[in-house]
Swiss-Prot record:
<protein>
    <recommendedName>
        <fullName>Biotin-dependent acetyl-/propionyl-coenzyme A carboxylase beta5 subunit</fullName>
        <ecNumber>2.1.3.15</ecNumber>
        <ecNumber>2.1.3.-</ecNumber>
    </recommendedName>
</protein>
<comment type="function">
    <text>Component of a biotin-dependent acyl-CoA carboxylase complex. This subunit transfers the CO2 from carboxybiotin to the CoA ester substrate. When associated with the alpha3 subunit AccA3, is involved in the carboxylation of acetyl-CoA and propionyl-CoA.</text>
</comment>
<comment type="similarity">
    <text>Belongs to the AccD/PCCB family.</text>
</comment>
<dbReference type="GO" id="GO:0016740">
    <property type="term" value="F:transferase activity"/>
</dbReference>
<dbReference type="GO" id="GO:0004658">
    <property type="term" value="F:propionyl-CoA carboxylase activity"/>
</dbReference>
<dbReference type="InterPro" id="IPR034733">
    <property type="entry name" value="AcCoA_carboxyl_beta"/>
</dbReference>
<dbReference type="InterPro" id="IPR029045">
    <property type="entry name" value="ClpP/crotonase-like_dom_sf"/>
</dbReference>
<dbReference type="Pfam" id="PF01039">
    <property type="entry name" value="Carboxyl_trans"/>
</dbReference>
<comment type="pathway">
    <text>Lipid metabolism; mycolic acid biosynthesis.</text>
</comment>
<keyword id="KW-0808">Transferase</keyword>
<comment type="subunit">
    <text>The biotin-dependent acyl-CoA carboxylase complex is composed of AccA3, which contains the biotin carboxylase (BC) and biotin carboxyl carrier protein (BCCP) domains, and AccD5, which contains the carboxyl transferase (CT) domain.</text>
</comment>
<feature type="domain" description="CoA carboxyltransferase N-terminal">
    <location>
        <begin position="25"/>
        <end position="281"/>
    </location>
</feature>
<feature type="domain" description="CoA carboxyltransferase C-terminal">
    <location>
        <begin position="295"/>
        <end position="542"/>
    </location>
</feature>
<dbReference type="GO" id="GO:0009317">
    <property type="term" value="C:acetyl-CoA carboxylase complex"/>
</dbReference>
<dbReference type="InterPro" id="IPR011763">
    <property type="entry name" value="COA_CT_C"/>
</dbReference>
<dbReference type="InterPro" id="IPR051047">
    <property type="entry name" value="AccD/PCCB"/>
</dbReference>
<dbReference type="InterPro" id="IPR011762">
    <property type="entry name" value="COA_CT_N"/>
</dbReference>
């Protein structure tokens, strides 16, 4: 029930409005102030209180939390929808449900939009879509990263097909901007229908644990059509899209954590494809590689186990190679048999792609191949050198992998790496067998500098499998003669390992540029990055390659 006090307040507001004389300069300024204030609270303060009660920020608060203080410049703050159907003519909130503009992050210009779930549930209508299209085009034209903060419920049904038309324009702009400017999407609530395709077209997708959901069709529709019972979190929650679908690149513990991750990832990225990622003028070491060895470098000399079948954590290698041991891992919970992420070596941003021996022995499978391929393409788009750390016994065997398309989908990594023109450096730490050796940054796939540790095992296959092929007849004859076949097999395996399973055969043929002590790895990579800083590489003229999608 509305109180007498509420009626009095409303009457006073109406009286104040009537006292503004818009025919004077002072009145015009007062009118602007009134409209600007209305844009800040388009549906009233109570709606914001409901958002806060859920532990979430409002659309504007999210922008302020992400950007540098006092840097946000809003665009189209006074826009309103033009629809009159279904009573919308009487309900025209200022801003139409999305806040757009530009500002700075660490002093670098970015364009941004933030969807307002308090206005029509964050649903996209014509003017809402036009605002996003406008800021997308501004980002492309000025060569600035674009950040989208998503919290909306799909198309605005009351506005009909124009909503779908604007979705299509947004998607097309995402595609035109791809590889030109970094595009980052944050999912801060339940995003459904058309709201999920734009984030899927961007470079990085950040979700918030227990807060974010993404799906094309919701649980109710799925229940009706298929009979399946599934919750929103199970269907499209942050961990679902990290561990199962691979759509999410980072799962944040809260909204501020999500904003911090975006600021971090931007620090490794250039503003556009014609510029380089930021550098922070770190002093360059003088003297030889040996002169600059640290205790962390020396730890690498004892990291690889004596047994080739004993795993180790590749993160232990990665962090020791990077400045300040800082590694921004991407998709850490997806396809964990491969590790990808960003770091710096001598202040130069690099992309790391590394097999993970503690998961599937580091084997490549479908998901790992696609995860690595996408990351390689992101690095190539934005002029970030690629460093591969290789310990791979092969592709994961099994009928499931074969039926699901490991041939075609594994070839995506081959294609992505072969097409990349950025500096490419490979370090083989241990196993590099068969076709997986070729895929993981081999010299003949176009790698610029190939290094190997003395523990490297570069061969068509491991000793156990090879002996079964090469000495099949000898083993069969030994069995017939009653000899100790197991003892003979071990002897032949040792002979094979001593002869072929090492880095030196590849080094003799130039497939490895240098066999180095593990402790020298960071120094060798740093000098290679310096050498390749102005690398010139050209692909044959073409419209585009036909990657095996």
């Amino acid at each position: 029930m509305t109180s007498v006090t509420d009626h009095s307040a409303h009457s006073m507001e109406r009286a104040a409005e009537h006292t503004i004389n818009i025919h004077t300069t002072a009145g015009k300024l007062a009118e602007l102030h009134k409209r600007t204030e209305e844009a800040l609270h388009p549906v009233g303060a109570a709606a914001f209180e409901k958002v806060h009660a859920k532990g979430k920020f409002t659309a504007r608060e999210r922008i302020y939390a992400l950007l540098d203080d006092d840097s946000f410049v809003e665009l189209d703050a006074l826009a309103r929808h033009r629809s009159t159907n279904f009573g919308l003519g009487e309900n025209r909130p200022v801003g139409d449900g999305v806040v757009t503009g530009y500002g700075t992050i660490d002093g670098r210009d970015v364009c941004i939009f933030s969807q307002d779930v308090t206005v029509f549930g964050g649903s996209l209508g014509e003017v809402y879509g036009e605002k996003i299209v406008k800021v997308q085009e501004l980002a492309i034209k000025t060569g600035r990263p674009l950040i989208g903060i998503n919290d909306g419920a799909g198309a605005r049904i009351q506005e009909g097909v124009v909503s779908l038309g604007l979705y299509s324009r947004i998607f097309r702009n995402n595609i035109l901007a791809s590889g030109v400017i970094p595009q980052i999407s944050l999912i801060m609530g339940a995003a459904a229908g058309g709201h999920v395709y734009s984030p899927a077209l961007t470079d990085f997708v950040v979700m918030v644990d227990q807060t974010s959901q993404m799906f094309i069709t919701g649980p109710d529709v799925i229940k009706t059509v298929t009979g399946e019972d599934v919750t929103m979190e199970e269907l499209g929650g942050a961990h679902t899209h990290m561990a199962k679908s691979g759509t999410a690149h980072y799962v944040a513990s809260g909204e501020q954590d999500a904003f911090d991750w975006v600021r971090d990832v931007l620090s490794y990225l250039p503003s556009n494809n014609f510029t380089d990622a930021p550098r922070y003028s770190k002093p360059v070491p003088h003297g030889s590689i040996e002169d600059n060895l640290t205790a962390k470098d020396l730890e690498l000399d004892t990291l690889i186990p004596d047994s080739p079948n004993q795993p180790y954590d590749m993160h232990e290698v990665v962090t020791r190679l990077l400045d300040e041991e800082e590694f921004l891992e991407v998709q850490a919970g997806y396809a964990t048999n491969i590790v990808v992420g960003l770091g710096r070596i001598d202040d130069r941003p690099v992309g790391i792609v590394a097999n993970q021996p503690i998961q599937f022995a580091g084997c490549l499978d479908i998901n790992a191949s696609e995860k690595a391929a996408r990351f390689v393409r992101v690095c190539d788009c934005f002029n970030i050198p690629i460093v591969m750390l290789v310990d791979v016994p092969g592709f994961l065997p099994g009928t499931e992998q074969e039926y699901d398309g490991i041939i075609r989908r594994g070839a995506k990594l081959l294609f992505a790496y072969g097409e990349a023109t950025v500096p490419k450096i490979t370090v083989i730490t241990r196993k590099a067998y068969g076709g997986a050796y070729c895929v993981m940054g081999s010299k003949n796939m176009g790698c610029d500098v190939n290094l190997a540790w003395p523990t490297a095992q570069i061969a068509v296959m491991g000793a156990s499998g090879a002996v079964g092929f090469v000495y099949r007849k000898e083993l069969a004859q030994a069995a017939k003669n009653g000899a100790n076949v197991d003892e003979l097999r071990l002897q032949l395996q040792q002979e094979y390992e001593d002869t072929l399973v090492n880095p030196y055969i590849a080094a003799e043929r130039g497939y490895v540029d240098a066999v180095i002590p593990p402790s020298h790895t960071r120094g060798y990579i740093a000098t290679a990055l310096h050498l390749l800083e102005r690398k010139i590489a050209h692909l044959p003229p073409k419209k585009h390659g036909n990657i095996p999608l």
